[in-house]
Design a protein with these regions (language model features):
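Phosphate/NTP-binding elements of NTP-utilizing enzymes
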Residues: 1-155
Length: 157
């Protein structure tokens, strides 16, 4: 069952806004529904593009976002998903459409260099308040493809 707040996340791609900020309790399902909506939006609007999936660390991002997404039955039914752990890239295909979701960790002030120079069509930043400002600003700046959108989740610290 989808809650009214989760329905708003699913509707975000069709809004006039360029950014979504989700705030909610831990284990409320916001990250899972955001990732589903993020990938669905990317696959419906782009092909051959790169997207950022950002967490505090690459490992936490992999465990909390990538692995649950690849295990999601709806995702497995709709897409061909290939997770290349060594490259930190999840390749998602459906028909002639292929997009790449690159995982980044924003754990310290030097982390911005990991995303610097990339061109992204969108980014999802999970638990963004735990990331240094320099990393967040660099991720936002990298979203320079026309039509790019930002997806951010907050936690209370």
């Amino acid at each position: 069952m989808i809650s009214p707040k989760q329905a708003k996340i699913l509707a975000f791609p069709y809004s006039k806004y360029d950014a979504l900020i989700c705030d909610g309790a831990v284990r409320s399902g916001k990250t899972s529904i955001m990732m589903w909506a993020f990938v669905r939006w990317a696959m419906e609007n782009f092909s051959g593009q790169r997207f950022g999936v950002c967490g505090r660390t690459v490992d936490s991002c992999t465990k909390n976002i990538i692995v649950p997404f690849t295990a999601m039955s709806l995702a497995k039914e709709r897409y061909i998903i290939r997770w290349r752990r060594g490259d930190k890239v999840m390749e998602v295909r459906r028909g002639a459409v292929t997009n790449y979701f690159e995982v980044f960790g924003g754990k310290d002030e030097a982390s911005y260099t990991l995303i610097q120079g990339r061109t992204l069509a969108g980014a999802l930043l999970d638990e963004v308040v735990l990331m240094p400002r320099s990393f967040v600003e660099q991720a936002l700046t990298r979203c320079s493809v026309d039509g790019a959108k930002l997806w951010l989740s907050l936690i209370h610290i």
